[in-house]
From Swiss-Prot:
Gene behind this protein: hisI
Gene Ontology CC: one annotated term: cytoplasm
InterPro entries listed in its UniProt record: PRA-CH, PRib_AMP_CycHydrolase_dom, PRib_AMP_CycHydrolase_sf
Signal peptide: none
Residues reported to bind Mg(2+): 78, 80, 82
Pathway: Amino-acid biosynthesis; L-histidine biosynthesis; L-histidine from 5-phospho-alpha-D-ribose 1-diphosphate: step 3/9
Name under which the protein is recorded: Phosphoribosyl-AMP cyclohydrolase
Organism: Nitrosococcus oceani (strain ATCC 19707 / BCRC 17464 / JCM 30415 / NCIMB 11848 / C-107)
GO biological process annotation, one example: L-histidine biosynthetic process
Similarity comment: family membership: Belongs to the PRA-CH family.
Binding site for Zn(2+): 79, 96, 103
Length: 132
């Protein structure tokens, strides 16, 4: 496949683009992460979500430690070409490193952020494999 489509992406000055992962089955927004050119290309080639970690300065395949992979169903580029939407099948039922289904679990209620989704599995058990 030609990679000319990558030239249509409006990368920011750091060479990144925000990537929204949305659950294909439910339509729920799971998370927001960042992709560089290599991450987006690898995602397309592998069929699994691969992001760029701004803190670790490296690629990371979603689920590489937890097993909670995201299988790509479709990829959309927004009207300004500066954000991508990944429609995914979320494996393991959790997208958030906090052990919740999605990262957007805090809702503003009366001037305070309230956690409105339960922890499905403790992060310690996810990343230390202590209960597997």
């Amino acid at each position: 496949m030609s990679l000319g489509w990558l030239e249509d992406v409006a990368w920011n000055k750091e060479g990144l683009i925000p990537a929204i992962a949305q659950e294909d089955r439910t339509g729920q927004v799971l998370m927001l992460a960042w992709m560089n050119r290599e991450a987006l290309e690898t995602t397309v080639q592998s069929g699994y979500a691969v992001y760029w970690s701004r803190s670790r300065k490296r690629l990371w395949r979603k689920g590489e430690q937890s097993g909670h992979e995201q299988i790509i169903k479709a990829i959309h580029l927004d009207c300004d070409s500066d954000a991508v939407l990944l429609l995914v099948e979320q494996k393991g039922g959790m997208a958030c490193h906090t052990g919740r289904h999605r990262c957007f679990f805090k809702r503003l209620e009366k001037g305070n952020w309230a956690s409105v989704e339960p922890v499905l599995k403790s992060p310690d058990s996810i990343y230390n494999n202590s209960d597997e």
